[in-house]
Structure formats: structure tokens, C-alpha cells
């Protein structure tokens, strides 16, 4: 099979389930691996904001795992972002989130797998945990098929099937609903995918064990599923009417904020540093070097952030805070995303050279964007261990899980946004920072409750809030312009 002539018509499937824990991650990742092993170029996608599953998807396919989140980015960007990721691919596999019809709390279908399937005009394959039922599976499947006629459930994969007789009973029941059974996975020891306080352990921390786990998922799906039928179902989709997202075009189309009004007698503003203007070539012909944290402690990042920074004129280089003793030479801006600094607090604290390098850059006024784990790293201490000391705040682990979507507005002008900029984000952590906000907070939260959060100091913007810059491309442009002027 060759790549689709029209990217908008790429064959595609959505792997969903009635609820979490049904096996959709195993099936989705295994299907990606099985199709890749057959020589297909597979585009991997994940519904929702989760950073960890896309790492397994990337391992299965050899391509960047990408998120499709209608809450963070808006429904209008789901199709374009999907097509951007699927360029040049033979087929796309989209792993759902939670149950098929579960979305943002109190928002109807918003951010649900069902909504994304409809936006992509993609058939859904329902993964059903059949371990404790037989004929009742027909009622369950019938309910999911009939709940929303706009959602096309094209087949079922039965998981945790006990025996040949159990399989026969299940097939007979599902046949009565008129939905084909596209796979049967027998009850077996689960593939080794260890979890901890925030879900699966990321790929970056598991090394060869993650490779083995993905291979096992692929073998299980290849043995138990009708791959030809699944590919045929994926090919039954039509073209999408939207165009693929492009980072450069997004920057051009994103409206710039107004120029500041100069004070009397002040020199006119330099047009090269107009906030929000599509990036002109810098006078010295150089791109601005932005260092981005990576490695086992900082694995949470959306690929579009790097693409937007590059389109805005940055040279993005990665570094590992666990191993590198200083920031990359010539660093002019710093991005520290999410991850698990609490797991690696001792190692991060022991790397005094890098902590000093980060602090020096931050205190120089250079732009620093830190989300969640990045916020913790910039604090004075984490669980009593010294961190970078950029923020006069202390972080500690907590038993309480903070989780959910947030509506936010920028409270203070910063390296990322002008005050009043509205964005949507999500929080996902088991830590506490005290105080929770600085004299100049980063965000004012409007939902689910009103509060201020985060820190804006010098060029630093640090917050628990994870955002998706594709929803507000001017964030990347403003950050790179700040690199140019700091």
C-alpha cells in the first residue's frame, strides 16, 4: 500500500472503549505496531491532553505521537492538526480517551472521543472487556451504536475472552446487533506496562523494556485481530474538507497584539521586535537558540510547540537536566515542560552546575517558560532538596491528585502572553507549591473555580497549567521575540 495521494483522505480509525481499563491502549498501540511491521507508514494520535500514551505510539510507529484535543485547541483545529500529523502516511490510528462518550465535565460531548471521531469522519472500533459477560455484550454494543447516530461504530474487538465457547457466545451476541467482530484477544497475563502516581511510566524511563512491551502488544493484536478488515474499514473514510495545519501559516494568521504606546520623547518602537509580527530575519542572520528540557525527568511536550518555535525563528536544541552540567552554548531562551522531577529530585538537585546555569539565564532576564514539572524545578526546593532557586517558593509531593481542564486568562504581561490573553489548559499533578502564586501571577483561573496561579518574574513565566500553543500561536512568536530583545 502506498501513501494516500490526498492527505485529507488518509485512511483512519478511532480505537475507543466503553470505559477506561477496557484495553484500548493495548489495542491501539498494538495495532500501530502490527501495521508498521507490515510496512505501512502509520500516523499515531491520542485524543485528549495525555503526554504518556503518545510516547508508546511513537515507539510503535517511528513517528511523533500527536494529541487531538478539542478543549485545548478548539474543535476547528482537530481536523487540521490531524492532517498535519498524518502527512505522507498510509493510515492513521487514533487512540481515544476514557469512555467513548466521556468528555470535559459539564461540557456535553466536548473533548470526547466521539466528538473527535465525528470531526474526523472516522469509523470507531469499540474495544470491549468481555471478561465477565456473554450475551449482555449485545446490549452494551447496541447502546453505544444507537446513542449517537453520527458516530459510526464499524466494528468490535473483544478483549479478555476466556475460551473458545466464550468466544462463540460473544460472537453470536454481537452478530445480533449487526456489528462485525474484528478481533478477539484471549485472557492472558497483561503486557508489562508499570504505572505510578500519574499513570503509565513514560517510554523514556523504560528503555528496552518499553520496546519489548510495544512488541508484545503488536504481536497480540496481529494474532487476534483481522488486520485486513481493520485496514479496509479505515479505507472507507472520505476526505476531510479542511487543510492541514502548518506552523508558519498559523503564525501569519494569528493576530498580533497592538504595539505599546511610547512615552513622550521615547524612541519609536523597533519594527523588528513588534510583538506578534510574523518573524522577520534577524539583522545578524541568526536564529535565536531556545533550549528545551528533555530526558527522563521532562518528557511532557507537544510536538507543535517545537514546530511553532522553529517557524517563529528559533533554533530549538534539547538538553537533559539529569546529565548535562550546563545549558547548551548560546542559549537565549529556555522551555521546561512537564514530567517527573519529583521522581528524580535527588539527581536534579545533585546537578549543581546546571541549576546554576538555569538560574543565571533566568536572572539575566532571558525568557523562560516552565510548565508543571518546570515550575517545580525553578522553585527554591522540592521535597527539601535544593532546586534552581529562580522562584522564592517551595514544592512538595502531595497525596491529592489535581486533575482537569482549566479556563485561564493571563494576569500579567509576560514572555508568553500579554495580560488579558485567554487560553485553555489542563492540570495533572500530585504536588503543591507554596506560595501558589507570585506578586505577578501567571494566570487567573476562571473554571472550575476562580483563583490566581503561577509566577511572572523578569522573563520567567512559570505555572502548573499545561497549554497547547497551536491554540494561540502568538505565544511562540512572542517568546522568540523576547529572546531577541532580552
Swiss-Prot record:
Active-site residue numbers: 372
SUPFAM superfamilies for the chain: Class I glutamine amidotransferase-like, P-loop containing nucleoside triphosphate hydrolases
Cofactor dependence: Mg(2+)
Pfam families: CbiA, GATase_3
Reaction catalyzed: hydrogenobyrinate + 2 L-glutamine + 2 ATP + 2 H2O = hydrogenobyrinate a,c-diamide + 2 L-glutamate + 2 ADP + 2 phosphate + 2 H(+)
Protein's pathway: Cofactor biosynthesis; adenosylcobalamin biosynthesis; cob(II)yrinate a,c-diamide from precorrin-2 (aerobic route): step 9/10
GATase cobBQ-type domain location: 289-474
InterPro entries assigned to the protein according to its UniProt record, in alphabetical order: CbiA/CobB_synth (IPR004484), Class_I_gatase-like (IPR029062), CobQ/CobB/MinD/ParA_Nub-bd_dom (IPR002586), GATase_3 (IPR011698), P-loop_NTPase (IPR027417)
Domains (record comment): Comprises of two domains. The C-terminal domain contains the binding site for glutamine and catalyzes the hydrolysis of this substrate to glutamate and ammonia. The N-terminal domain is anticipated to bind ATP and hydrogenobyrinate and catalyzes the ultimate synthesis of the diamide product. The ammonia produced via the glutaminase domain is probably translocated to the adjacent domain via a molecular tunnel, where it reacts with an activated intermediate.
The name this protein goes by in its record: Hydrogenobyrinate a,c-diamide synthase
Organism of derivation: Streptomyces coelicolor (strain ATCC BAA-471 / A3(2) / M145)
Amino acid at each position: 500500500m502506498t501513501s494516500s495521494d490526498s492527505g485529507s483522505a488518509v485512511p483512519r480509525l478511532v480505537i475507543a472503549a466503553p470505559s477506561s481499563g477496557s484495553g484500548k491502549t493495548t489495542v491501539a498501540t498494538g495495532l500501530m505496531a502490527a501495521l508498521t511491521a507490515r510496512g505501512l507508514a502509520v500516523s499515531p494520535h491520542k485524543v485528549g491532553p495525555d503526554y504518556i500514551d503518545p510516547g508508546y505510539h511513537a515507539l510503535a510507529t517511528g513517528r511523533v505521537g500527536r494529541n487531538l484535543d478539542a478543549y485545548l485547541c478548539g474543535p476547528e483545529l482537530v481536523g487540521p492538526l490531524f492532517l498535519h500529523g498524518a502527512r505522507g502516511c498510509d493510515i492513521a490510528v487514533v487512540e481515544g480517551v476514557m469512555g467513548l462518550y466521556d468528555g470535559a465535565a459539564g461540557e456535553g460531548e466536548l473533548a470526547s472521543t466521539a466528538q473527535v471521531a465525528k470531526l474526523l469522519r472516522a469509523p470507531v472500533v469499540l474495544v470491549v472487556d468481555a471478561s465477565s459477560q456473554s450475551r449482555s455484550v449485545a446490549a452494551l454494543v447496541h447502546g453505544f451504536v444507537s446513542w449517537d447516530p453520527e458516530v459510526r461504530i464499524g466494528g468490535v474487538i473483544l478483549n479478555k475472552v476466556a475460551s473458545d465457547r466464550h468466544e462463540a457466545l460473544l460472537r453470536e451476541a454481537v452478530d445480533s446487533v449487526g456489528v462485525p467482530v474484528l478481533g478477539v484477544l484471549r485472557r492472558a497475563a497483561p503486557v508489562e506496562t508499570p504505572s505510578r502516581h500519574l499513570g503509565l511510566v513514560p517510554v523514556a524511563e523504560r528503555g528496552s523494556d518499553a520496546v519489548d512491551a510495544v512488541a508484545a502488544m503488536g504481536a497480540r493484536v496481529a494474532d487476534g485481530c483481522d488486520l485486513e478488515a481493520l485496514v479496509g474499514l479505515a479505507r472507507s473514510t472520505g476526505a476531510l474538507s479542511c487543510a492541514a495545519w502548518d506552523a508558519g501559516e498559523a503564525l501569519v494568521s494569528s493576530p498580533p497584539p497592538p504595539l505599546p504606546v511610547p512615552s513622550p520623547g521615547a524612541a519609536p518602537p523597533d519594527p523588528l521586535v513588534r510583538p506578534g509580527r510574523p518573524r522577520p530575519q534577524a539583522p545578524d542572520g541568526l536564529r535565536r537558540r531556545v533550549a528545551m528540557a528533555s530526558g527522563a525527568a521532562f518528557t511532557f511536550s507537544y510536538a507543535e510547540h517545537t514546530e511553532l518555535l522553529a517557524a517563529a525563528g528559533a533554533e530549538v536544541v534539547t538538553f537533559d537536566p539529569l546529565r548535562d552540567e550546563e545549558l547548551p552554548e548560546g542559549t537565549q531562551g529556555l522551555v521546561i515542560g512537564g514530567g517527573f522531577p519529583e521522581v528524580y529530585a535527588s539527581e536534579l538537585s545533585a546537578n549543581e552546575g546546571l541549576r546554576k546555569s538555569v538560574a543565571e539565564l533566568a536572572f539575566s532576564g532571558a525568557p523562560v517558560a516552565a510548565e508543571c514539572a518546570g515550575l517545580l524545578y525553578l522553585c527554591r526546593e522540592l521535597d527539601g532538596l535544593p532546586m534552581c532557586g529562580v522562584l522564592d517558593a517551595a514544592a512538595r509531593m502531595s497525596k491529592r491528585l489535581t486533575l482537569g481542564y482549566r479556563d485561564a486568562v493571563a494576569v500579567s504581561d509576560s514572555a508568553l502572553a500579554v495580560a488579558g490573553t485567554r487560553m485553555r489548559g489542563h492540570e495533572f499533578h500530585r504536588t503543591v507549591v507554596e506560595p501558589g502564586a507570585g506578586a505577578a501571577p501567571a494566570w487567573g483561573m476562571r473554571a472550575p473555580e476562580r483563583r490566581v496561579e503561577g509566577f511572572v518574574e523578569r522573563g520567567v513565566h512559570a505555572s502548573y497549567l499545561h497549554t497547547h500553543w497551536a491554540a494561540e500561536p502568538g505565544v511562540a512568536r512572542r517568546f522568540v521575540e523576547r529572546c531577541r530583545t532580552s
